[in-house]
Amino acid sequence: MCVVGAGPAGAALAGACQRLGLATALVDVAPDRPWSATYGMWTPELPPDLPAGVVAARAEGRVVALTDRLLGWEYAVLDVPALQAHLSEGLSGVRVYASRAVGSPRPGVLALADGTELQASIIVDAGGQARPLNLRRRGRERAAQTAYGMFLDEQLAAPLIEPGEALFMDWRQEHGEDGWPTFLYVIPLGGGRVLVEETSLARRPGLPLPTLHRRLRTRLARYGIVPPADAAVERVAFTVDHPRHRASGVLGFGAAAPLIHPATGFSLATSLRLAPQVAAALAANLPRGPKPALTAAHDTVWPRSARIVHHLRRVGLEALLRMPPADVPAFFEQFFELPERHRWTYLTARDDVAGNVAALTHLFRASNRRLRGHLVRPALLPPLPSNEPVLN
């Protein structure tokens, strides 16, 4: 089999397949390039086989919408070089091609930019947001999560979080601007460093990074924080409403699938947990041929229950995109007032239909008439074409 994309999802799946005895190849234009993103997940989502050393910091989750509250959940921030080293160790025996995949012209064939064609029983697109094997015409404008962050010394960032704490969301308008709502995200990284980030959860199209940079500096200034001129920065921009990967004869995996939670942007925990399951489905069914194996793998990534939950979450995303900016903090206040089991299910349980329906039903019943309208309207209307009329 052949996996396109040597990011966390692709590396995890390629390694899992190799461990089960499947001859595996991995294709990436720069397979050894260091991963630059910051990754975190809730502690109960950590895969059981992930070494303890891959977790750089653990912190108690806190949110601020209309009020300030602790979530009662622990957030794990990963040591990304350690994660990459761990997953790379699993690639022993995997044949790696440093090349760019340009398509799958026919079943079982992967075309590379240099004209080479690789033969494989199963081809997986784990190429992230680029989805190099899902060559479809661009449709409507996509919604994106964007963020601008800075890496600061923990003492400099001390006014924002207490020791042992992670600020998951702070919706207070301390950035001093009207227009599209954004929140502050602050997490400890270990080693005395903290990431402070101004984030637009979702917008169609994504909120420009210069806007987020400006807001972050204004927000930090309110706390007397002046970042050093040489502070390292993080720039984030990724689509949160890609349609499901439907390229013929290809399995989409990771962000390419997309396994991204439409309402949070998280996908790593799901990808790491699914990788061994997908590998097992392929290994069990390949003796029957590529088609049964591909079907089994696709059903592992997208069982009917996961498709239903993904649709419900997409409706939630559209509700957020249509919501007047002034109502967004009140919406999140209502959401975080939900019983813990409902919050946890909506944020993490990708195939629990009954649990997600119960969470949304509870949210609807607890909401006032105005918020109920915001929740129902997206289910009755087509996706909003653009948020551009809203000031940014």
Which positions does each model-derived feature cover?
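Short beta-strand to alpha-helix junction loop
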Residues: 69-89, 126, 202-211
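Predominantly flavin-linked oxidoreductase catalytic cores and closely associated redox partners
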Residues: 93-227, 244-246
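FAD/FMN-dependent oxidoreductases across multiple families
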Residues: 174-175, 199-282, 287
